Amino acid sequence: MHYEVIVDTGILLALIDRNDSHHTWVTERLKEIAPPLLTCEAVISESWFLLQRVKRGREALLQLLAQKQIIIQFDLDAELVTIMALLSRYQSVPVSLADAELIRMSELYPNSLNVYSR
């Protein structure tokens, strides 16, 4: 069975930043997974901001997108009502927009591997 893999900001940061404490672990795990990795624009935006101090980090992020290693597979316009409901439902947690989009993506891709932590 083929699985789509949904990634969050932490995975992208660890993949790109060689100084990240999880870099080796993430790169080893991703060798086992066929691209593309799925994500959303909110994750790309968070990653862009957090990569500002990583030498060539933003360039690496754009290259991953250009090479289709990572693809944006979420349409906020189409899912806005559901996202608003998720943000309301989890307001006590709280969740970010990126978190809500990833939750929705896991619902849209039931065969996804979306919990990827050590």
Where are the predicted features?
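Metal-dependent nucleic-acid phosphoesterase active-site entry motif
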Residues: 1-20
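Detector for Asparagine
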Residues: 19, 111-114
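PIN-domain endoribonuclease scaffold, especially VapC-family toxins
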Residues: 3-5, 24-94, 104, 108-112
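Conserved residues at the C-terminal ends of beta-strands
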Residues: 117
